[in-house]
Regions:
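GHKL-family ATPase ATP-binding module
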Residues: 1-171
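Single conserved hydrophobic/aromatic residue that forms the stacking wall/gate
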Residues: 170-179
């Protein structure tokens, strides 16, 4: 059987920063584009957080959180160890071992579920961060954008949509001579 291991550290901050630490490694090889272990990690985090929120009835009705909401304010490092890792491409920037994804997801969910349920106060704060991120995402996606009624080439300058910051109306009134 193939030996698999995963170690991770995660830290949630009160707000998100531009350069959040998120690093992934396989057998100490940096995987800049993540891959199976990162996807499994996110999946496990999401499952554990959904379960925690469901047990405590924290999640507002109709709001759905996703993995990106859970890690929005988090910094993390994931280190996986595999006997025969499969990488996508020769540069080893992305792990492509499907079996390892399920392993990491299960391990992450189990560990985080136990931690959240033994540290409920901190767990609720983390859940609030995820809920806040989900609400921000939902609000941004529901922002009404102007529907394009005309499909085709872009309009010339005179006919293009006006800039709401500098908009005006120009009226031309006819004169006596019909002009």
């Amino acid at each position: 059987t193939e030996t698999q291991e995963v170690d991770f550290v995660i830290n949630w901050l009160n707000k998100s920063y531009k350069d959040m630490l998120d690093e992934t490694y396989v057998n100490l090889i940096p995987t800049a584009h993540g891959g199976s272990h990162l996807n499994g990690f996110k999946s496990g985090l999401l499952e554990a957080m959904k379960e925690f929120c469901e047990i405590r009835s924290i999640l507002p009705k109709g709001l759905k959180i996703n993995a990106e909401d859970v890690i929005a304010n988090a910094t993390f490092v994931i280190s996986s160890k595999l006997q025969n890792p499969q990488f996508a491409g020769q540069t080893k920037e992305r792990l492509d071992s499907k079996d390892h994804m399920a392993f990491v997801s299960s391990a992450t969910k189990d560990i985080l579920s136990i931690w959240l349920n033994t540290h409920t106060e901190e767990g609720e704060k983390i859940a609030e961060l995820a809920i806040s991120a989900a609400q921000s995402r939902a609000k941004a996606s529901s922002t009404v954008q102007r529907k394009k009624t005309f499909k085709g080439p872009a309009l010339p300058g005179k006919l293009s949509d006006c800039n709401s910051a500098v908009s005006y109306t120009h009226l031309t009134l006819p004169t006596k001579d019909g002009g």
